[in-house]
Swiss-Prot record:
It comes from the Bacteria. Substrate binds at K128, D160. Transmembrane segments: none annotated. This is tRNA (guanine-N(7)-)-methyltransferase. It catalyses: guanosine(46) in tRNA + S-adenosyl-L-methionine = N(7)-methylguanosine(46) in tRNA + S-adenosyl-L-homocysteine. HAMAP family: tRNA_methyltr_TrmB (MF_01057). Pathway: tRNA modification; N(7)-methylguanine-tRNA biosynthesis. One of its GO terms (molecular function) is tRNA (guanine(46)-N7)-methyltransferase activity.
Amino acid sequence: MRMRKKPWARPELEGCDFFVINPKEYKGKWKEFFGNDKPIYLELGCGKGTFMAVHASENPDINYIAIDIKDEVLGLAKRNIEKAYEEKNRKTDNVKLMAQEIGLISEILSEEDVVSRIYINFCNPWPKEKHKKRRLTHMRQLEQYKTFLKSEGEIYFKTDDDELFEESLEYFNEAGFRIKYITYDLHNSDVEGNVQTEHEKMFSEQGIKIKFLIAMKDN
């Protein structure tokens, strides 16, 4: 379903102190931009920001980068993140929000940026064969992530889609990642501290089991 236009979104984003208008300027300089050496966690496709809002507001010792492409969802993410920080009486000093085509993620991140963890939550499964290269877990994407993901850095991947999950396992293996953890039923697993996204809640209410894995970049 296409999201309705939100004329307020772009002006709000441009006036937001944690929205990065031109992220390409900071390629190789994200630690300098944050102003500290805290580890960097990256969410690819942050949607309405409910996942990022919880993680970033509860973990001040980690720097977070949240990426999506459309102003409409980024505007909602901005509001949700602000609300979470306000509830904890915290400044939004460890989170950056930006618009970027994820297929071109190397435009804004390089090996100097040293990302410790990547979150990929309920990305588009692109089921047609001719579209599979667009998947955020496809080999082509994983090779990009490897350039800025640190040695033994991790990718946390959640999906409702069985085919995407199984084929992603193959992608991770082919790209030289090691599967550190895997479950085909996240909500009945031993995983602690899971933060649900809006899609995750919706699929769970429909009785769909959530698949989850942690893939680690080997040395």
